[in-house]
Structures are given as C-alpha cells and as structure tokens.
Amino acid sequence: MSSQTQRQPDHGVVRQYSVFVENKVGRLSELVESLAKADVHILALCMVDSTDSVIIRIVVDHPEQAETVLNEHKFANDAMGVVALELPSEAHLQNVADILLRAEINIHYLYPFLFRPSGRCGLVLRADDQDLAAAVLARHGVTVLGQSDLAR
C-alpha cells in the first residue's frame, strides 16, 4: 500500500498467536498438522524455548479459523496484535529501525515471514504501541500490511 493512500481499517495490526507447548519432540509437527488440516497456513513463525516449554509465535492467513483449531486441539494460546511489514529487501531493516528510533518506539521483537507471494521481504514486529508504530512506518513510506493482505 502506498503511503499516499489512506489506510484501510485493517491495515497496521495483524493477529499473532503465541502458542505455549511442552518442549518435547513432535509438538511443532502437531501444531502445523492441526492448522494445515483446517486449511490454515502459517505465514510467519518464531520459536523461543526454555527448559520445559516453548512459545511458538505464529501469524496465519485466517486467524479466526486458527483460533478455533488451537482451542479444539487444546493448544494453550494468547492472541495479540503485531505489525506486519513488506520491505523491498533485507537492507531496509535499518530504515525501519531508524524510523522507530526517531519516533522513540521500542521494538520488543521481530521475526521474518516464511513466504511472501510478491517475493519481497516480510517482517513481523512487536513494539510498545502497534498502532503508533504502524502509522509512523506508513507515514515514512514503509509498506504496512493488514490481515486482508495475508489471506490466501
């Protein structure tokens, strides 16, 4: 989306699920299989482990269906908003970091998309304030994606 156009209602913040599982063999496979059977595609993924548990952060193409699957399969989860970005190349990460620094917005974490149909780099970003981060980045010409941009 061009920074010259008005933001669509869903642009700026997309839904991320943090899925909490035991740190044991096969749990990621179970999660991916459960979602795939419901025709839900994982578009971005990040795993953070500790001794006994793992937090699997995912952004999917159909969050409502994903939430149903997660709950039906008893995957403990928490939904929250994150900012999804599309960048011309990996070199533009510096630009994103600089824009948010100048706006005094802290980046809590970020991780890449697994796949973007346009062939561009994609990032998921969690900041102090998702709406403000999305607005500031869009104002500086960064392509901010909405949930409808992620649907297949």
Model features per residue range: what roles?
Residues 1-70, 77-90, 95-97, 101-152:
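Structural preference for solvent-exposed beta-strand-turn elements
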